Amino acid sequence: MHRPDVQIIVNTTPCGMFPNVGQCLIDPKAFPALEAVLDVVYNPFRTELLLRAEDCDVTAAGGFEMLVAQAVFATEHFTGRQLDTAAIIPAVSRELRHQLANVSIIGMPGCGKSTVGAALAKRLDKKFVDLDAEIERRTGHNIPDIFAQEGEAAFRRYETDVLAEIAKGNSQVIACGGGVIKSPANTRALRQNGPVLWVRRPLEALATGGRPLSKGGAALKQLEAERTPLYEAASTVVLENYGTLTAAVDKAVQLFEADERL
């Protein structure tokens, strides 16, 4: 399909809605004049259709605020009260999105993802999920053993499968492994329900002991050079983790609360 006459797309089907996330009926690239996409699906926040629209630099909006508006207008109807809908709907939508949003943390091995993530989850009253620990729990093997016995490709398959399930959830801080961004499917899974926070830390300050792909020295510099463009492409916000844990968490909270995408 190639339709140069279409400027706006509105999806009113349940395609892409939880639990069947990732489904999409059309490709925005087939519509060269496209200016905006509205998907009335509200879970996840960003369906595959919206993610594809964003990839095309097209204005995209989901159905979450519409869901809130429906509740507000229903309240008016059944109670007979007149509400300040222009103020209430966006305010309630933003508050609920902050409550439900995931914060996914990416970055180089040893940059502090798990440490910052656990503390951030406590501050935001969200569940903390360490993706590597969850992979170990589900496979029954620790990650160095998976790399040694099955290879990196097998580990990456486990990683993608586990993340696909976890990322469907809400109200989580997800600390990911350093190489999670190597798969576009992983990046899309992380983006569907909240911001992706890239934790950056000086190379010499990285804690790399016991990590399969982090040997230090020249190898670590090469790994950073390879992955930095992927972190840049996957992230929506950047946290410079150059100081104390408290400072990093304070800044992460500020970035989350100020995120205009929520």
Predicted features along the sequence, with ranges:
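Rossmann-like adenosine-cofactor binding region
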Residues: 1-60, 180-186
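Adenosine-phosphate binding glycine-rich loop
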Residues: 40-101, 241
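NTP-dependent small-molecule kinase module
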Residues: 87-99, 119, 123, 169, ...
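Hydrophobic anchor at the beta1->P-loop junction of P-loop NTPases
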Residues: 105
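P-loop (Walker A) phosphate-binding loop of NTP-binding proteins
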Residues: 108
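Conserved lysine of the Walker
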Residues: 113
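ATP-dependent small-molecule kinase phosphotransfer cores
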Residues: 133-191, 230
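A glycine- and Lys/Arg-enriched "phosphate-lid" helix/loop adjacent to the NTP-binding pocket
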Residues: 192-230
